[in-house]
Amino acid sequence: MSEMTPREIVSELDQHIIGQADAKRAVAIALRNRWRRMQLQEPLRHEVTPKNILMIGPTGVGKTEIARRLAKLANAPFIKVEATKFTEVGYVGKEVDSIIRDLTDSAMKLVRQQEIAKNRARAEDVAEERILDALLPPAKNQWGEVENHDSHSSTRQAFRKKLREGQLDDKEIEIDVSAGVSMGVEIMAPPGMEEMTNQLQSLFQNLGSDKTKKRKMKIKDALKALIDDEAAKLINPEELKQKAIDAVEQNGIVFIDEIDKICKKGEYSGADVSREGVQRDLLPLVEGSTVSTKHGMVKTDHILFIASGAFQVARPSDLIPELQGRLPIRVELTALSAADFERILTEPHASLTEQYKALMATEGVNIAFTTDAVKKIAEAAFRVNEKTENIGARRLHTVMERLMDKISFSASDMNGQTVNIDAAYVADALGEVVENEDLSRFIL
């Protein structure tokens, strides 16, 4: 779990997302409260439940990006789902319980990686010895007992040195690796049958888990495979499951996007299997229930839920009252201005202009954007959003792709050249398309 303070979390989010201070503060406080709760003693700790968040704002202002960045900062089980993918229990489609199953799978992967990292040093030593055994099989006497001579030991040390320096990386050897490592069985689940598919997959994996298979591979690949193999042997599967379930129950975060799309519209009274029914199915998860997963029973009482939606057609009050009550913190994200677009193009880490500069640099082309050019690009994107559909910052991708079209196509023939993109260049590339509303609608 992350131990970052709210100020540090907001500072980290500021490197990637422009504006939306209220939303950043809300998620930063929610994330820090997870850590604060874990410092409490029982039974008070059990009584402190997370305050779920509802983020409201037009498309393309940073709701989903906040979730993506939060996932990396949280260092906790995290899953992002689309509310529109689920249907009411009893109908064809995914049930909402699969959210918790997927979250538990995510936790298993996270905890497994953490455990492998803890045991990596020991696993590396054993893997190195197995590689050396394959390169220099120990000499045996007539009774089949291993003999250990000094000369053999000195040769082994010489090979160990070469192995560590990478001199043997491309040499091929034959090694025994666990069949489970090399033969992953993946089964695609039809809608509504995820549980049965999980059981089948576990069965196939268990069948090959104790078997080994001879494989011929390069030493650098063999070393990685053997390290994973040895690290996996040092992990207790039952302990791993329990740690993963604890991580989900105490620190899990679920981000539900497009929640406005499952609001009931108007007085429509027909079958609504993917709207109000889904909201009612979500209720037990959000307020706390027990979900059966292939790893064990998971309680959802202390999982943090963050929901988001544009609410352009529906309103938050169109959610069923019970669900509204389970999302007590409301955060409104504001629409982006031309000045915000200008900042988005230059300020964030790995901004769009930096990405295009780096891409063209691979062809030996140096790209420079003037301040006037950046301002004009931002204004063009903002104007197209006003004239047509407002898709927020996503419009910048379309405008930039149009602007860079000629350079991207000819870059391979421009090695060593420098291209200065100024206001005149932007006007020439985008002018007609931006001014003509019909062209904007179809091209940008």
Curated annotation (Swiss-Prot):
GO process annotations (BP): protein unfolding; proteolysis involved in protein catabolic process
Gene Ontology CC terms: HslUV protease complex
CDD domains, A to Z: RecA-like_HslU (cd19498)
UniProt KW Chaperone keyword: yes
Keywords: ATP-binding, Chaperone, Cytoplasm, Nucleotide-binding
Disulfide bonds: none
Entries under SUPFAM superfamilies matching the protein: P-loop containing nucleoside triphosphate hydrolases (SSF52540)
Binding-site positions, ATP: I18, G60, V61, G62, K63, T64, E65, D257, I306, A307, S308, G309, E322, R394
Subcellular location(s) per record: Cytoplasm
Family of the protein in this entry: Belongs to the ClpX chaperone family. HslU subfamily.
NCBIfam families, alphabetized: hslU, PRK05201.1
Job of this protein: ATPase subunit of a proteasome-like degradation complex; this subunit has chaperone activity. The binding of ATP and its subsequent hydrolysis by HslU are essential for unfolding of protein substrates subsequently hydrolyzed by HslV. HslU recognizes the N-terminal part of its protein substrates and unfolds these before they are guided to HslV for hydrolysis.
Protein name from the UniProt record: ATP-dependent protease ATPase subunit HslU
Originating organism: Haemophilus influenzae (strain ATCC 51907 / DSM 11121 / KW20 / Rd)
Top-level taxonomy: Bacteria, Pseudomonadati, Pseudomonadota, Gammaproteobacteria, Pasteurellales
